[in-house]
Amino acid sequence: MKISSGAINFSTIPNQVKKLITSIREHTKNGLTSKITSVKNTHTSLNEKFKTGKDSPIEFALPQKIKDFFQPKDKNTLNKTLITVKNIKDTNNAGKKNISAEDVSKMNAAFMRKHIANQTCDYNYRMTGAAPLPGGVSVSANNRPTVSEGRTPPVSPSLSLQATSSPSSPADWAKKLTDAVLRQKAGEALTAADRDFSNADFRNITFSKILPPSFMERDGDIIKGFNFSNSKFTYSDISHLHFDECRFTYSTLSDVVCSNTKFSNSDMNEVFLQYSITTQQQPSFIDTTLKNTLIRHKANLSGVILNEPDNSSPPSVSGGGNFIRLGDIWLQMPLLWTENAVDGFLNHEHNNGKSILMTIDSLPDKYSQEKVQAMEDLVKSLRGGRLTEACIRPVESSLVSVLAHPPYTQSALISEWLGPVQERFFAHQCQTYNDVPLPAPDTYYQQRILPVLLDSFDRNSAAMTTHSGLFNQVILHCMTGVDCTDGTRQKAAALYEQYLAHPAVSPHIHNGLFGNYDGSPDWTTRAADNFLLLSSQDSDTAMMLSTDTLLTMLNPTPDTAWDNFYLLRAGENVSTAQISPVELFRHDFPVFLAAFNQQATQRRFGELIDIILSTEEHGELNQQFLAATNQKHSTVKLIDDASVSRLATIFDPLLPEGKLSPAHYQHILSAYHLTDATPQKQAETLFCLSTAFARYSSSAIFGTEHDSPPALRGYAEALMQKAWELSPAIFPSSEQFTEWSDRFHGLHGAFTCTSVVADSMQRHARKYFPSVLSSILPLAWA
């Protein structure tokens, strides 16, 4: 019989114990019996030496070092050690013929180290509460250093040499794991026994509280090679940890928080894995097996290794449950398809991208057969649930985002069931997004929804013209989406060719303006006018615009130009100068109306009109001034004598000596919340208001090429003068200021065209304080 006690790390044992063991090893080489006698009933001798009582059973002849090592108060420790030594002797005698002297020495040394450590540490903790010192040393009541069992674990057990008992509580298990993990982190080579945490109990343990932060960091420390089989992790929190080459077989991970937990190269077979709803980020499984493991319906299985399923029965869970197979994994299903179950299991668009659909689809393509089989089982379950259209409606988008793509389109069962669902989804998209912009398409939308919409338009080509607002948006996002595939772009371009060939569309593209100017789209540049939207009211009217213009009008900024398009009637370009953008959008192209109105509400020029022309006294003029801001050109002119006189009556009191009256100036500051603003901020606002009144006085609005209302020119110049007084720095130069002032009044031979002045001032404001200009200037004038 060959017995090996394994290697002993003497570097972790205090010097006194080293000397003790060395002495014992020397004695055991000589047969041990020369120094240790058999048991005698010498009660008196022991009484005298240790005061232990009449029945002490042992007399010994150990080296003086052992006697000196223990004090009388350590008598129990000493007795246990002596019994151990006797056992060593008996074992030596029994196996003397089959055990080499070297093995005897190793075995005796291991026993001595083990028991001295156990008993002395036990004495320290139970009698004195002494804490271990660094390196595994503690101090006993007699101030003698001892080996701490908690700091220097025994070597790998062989045969019956292991005497360590399992921890009795989750806290003890956590402490043991912390010790082992830290030793591994320090570079110590752990034995299989060191890494054996089978049948452990980690219930309610938050691992971030027992491990250093480095284990929770991205690409941080790893828990590697541990055996957690048949262990309990119920209600524990293992978030952000990385377990590599670990075994969790038959373990219970019920209501465990495992946000962003990584399992790699691990065995998680036969595990009950239902992580807590507080898990915010899904755990990941990389090259990990999950045979017969119960998985929640919101898991990511992209790195799982599937194998052939066996004939095992579904797992039993409290409250019962339905299950489907995904390869050799069990996926939990609801008992009944209630409204809550439909939302919770199927609606990943409402549940942070998590659903049973996404769980199945997360497997690699090499498991296509298993994925299709699982989806077919899911569809059978849904079909058996006899769900109404109203119940399915909230999850139609989620369903088609997965099932309308390969490999599931290869299944006749899935395609037959999904067909009506996809038709209803498409009808809802047409109804909702023909007149309003689609949400900004993210990666999910570009890769999962846009291809479905293309497929639906392909099946229902009439919808391309009846819902050209939606169709053009879909093509736009397919051609510009950075996450769209080449296949998606090619299909979008092919569908648009069909659209351009439609009789309602083709008359508008052969005018030398469309695309590459010959009637074909030019997808090589976003500046080409490739898009053509049909009017929702008049089939003879269309809007032609470029990719960039369409994008900015659907998602505008304060600087968006709302007239950078061609308006076509019967294929001919018509002027939009006297067309109100808001009326054009409301009547013909409602897809832009909401965005335009939203930007218009941020323009505050009308507040000054209400100050000057109150609706109570000047209701008609108030409406004329506001209506003029909705178009680039006005047919109403205010240059006749009656109009000039009326305007002078209104504006002259505001401009004593040609300057803003203090009271009127304060009204302006109050209306635009500038009372406490800096002089520069006040000046920028007055400058922009001046550009607007310069526009009023020009031939584009209330003036003509040869005449303009003097009151409006004078008011525009007074606003500019006040801006100069407040902050000359906002002007290009004093010379430019003087030139603009002269143009307002025709002084010093200056050309009096206020349209030129308005354009020049507007360009300057857009360059140096665009946000102020965008908050004031009417959209139609921008």
Swiss-Prot record:
Assigned EC number: 2.3.2.26
Biological process, per Gene Ontology: protein ubiquitination
Keyword Ubl conjugation in record: yes
One Pfam assignment: SopA
Job description of the protein: Effector proteins function to alter host cell physiology and promote bacterial survival in host tissues. This protein is an E3 ubiquitin ligase that interferes with host's ubiquitination pathway. For instance, prevents host innate immune response by ubiquitinating and thus sending to degradation host E3 ubiquitin ligases TRIM56 and TRIM65.
Family indicated by similarity: Belongs to the SopA E3 ligase family.
Protein's name according to its UniProt entry: E3 ubiquitin-protein ligase SopA
